From Swiss-Prot:
It catalyses: aldehydo-D-ribose 5-phosphate + D-glyceraldehyde 3-phosphate + L-glutamine = pyridoxal 5'-phosphate + L-glutamate + phosphate + 3 H2O + H(+); L-glutamine + H2O = L-glutamate + NH4(+). It comes from Methanoculleus marisnigri (strain ATCC 35101 / DSM 1498 / JR1). In the presence of PdxS, forms a dodecamer of heterodimers. Only shows activity in the heterodimer. Catalyzes the hydrolysis of glutamine to glutamate and ammonia as part of the biosynthesis of pyridoxal 5'-phosphate. The resulting ammonia molecule is channeled to the active site of PdxS. This is Pyridoxal 5'-phosphate synthase subunit PdxT. Its EC number is 4.3.3.6, 3.5.1.2. The gene is pdxT. One of its GO terms (biological process) is pyridoxal phosphate biosynthetic process.
């Protein structure tokens, strides 16, 4: 049976997420990936990707477009990257961001500082046999993970990958670089 994935398409690296999920789902007949711009677009989805971008902008646009409550109440799995990790938390260090409270964790925005402080690193991620090339772009970190949150990866600055039930959140951008292992782990987790 196919998997239906939506990508929140308000701001950020939407096209990259759509392309990565399409490739990850290529061998699953009947699967689809679509941009999500309205609450009614969430119907019948198995999963939702909340992309990187600017978390305060995405938060504001979610409210403006009537998406905050529908996304916060979404029952499928959520794949959140960078700004998506910020939004998926239940506590954020910036009052301009209205967190969705999907994952019990505290997230600090822009923990890496300015754009010039962005970097790539080979990261050990729990469940992956080989290190993952992680692209951090003005990335957040989780400073605390709550009950039931599995920490998948951390760096000296903090926690950078977590799983909570069917949700996964990353401070980095797994949709960049062509390594789809984390997408596949996420998709396999939807079948639980």
């Amino acid at each position: 049976m196919g998997v239906k994935v939506g990508v929140l398409a308000l701001q950020g690296d939407v096209a990259e997420h759509i392309a990565a999920f399409r490739e990850a789902l290529a061998e699953r007949p009947g699967s689809s990936v679509a941009p999500i711009r309205r609450a009614e677009d969430l119907a019948d989805l198995d999963a939702l990707a909340i992309p990187g971008g600017e978390s305060t902008t995405i938060s504001r646009l979610m409210g403006k477009n009537g998406l905050y409550e529908p996304v916060a109440e979404f029952e499928g799995g959520v794949f959140a990257t960078c700004a998506g990790m910020v939004l998926s938390a239940d506590r954020v260090d910036d009052p301009r961001v209205r967190p969705l409270s999907l994952i019990p964790m505290h997230v600090a925005r822009n923990a890496f500082g300015r754009q010039v402080d962005s970097r790539e690193t080979m990261l050990e991620v729990a469940g992956l046999a080989e290190p993952f090339r992680a692209v951090f772009i003005r990335a957040p970190v989780a400073t605390e993970a709550g009950d039931g949150v599995e920490v998948l990866a951390r760096i000296p600055e903090g926690i950078v990958a977590v799983r909570h039930g069917r949700h996964m959140a990353f401070a980095f951008h797994p949709e960049l670089g062509g390594d789809l292992r984390l997408h596949r782990v996420f998709l396999e987790g939807l079948e639980v």
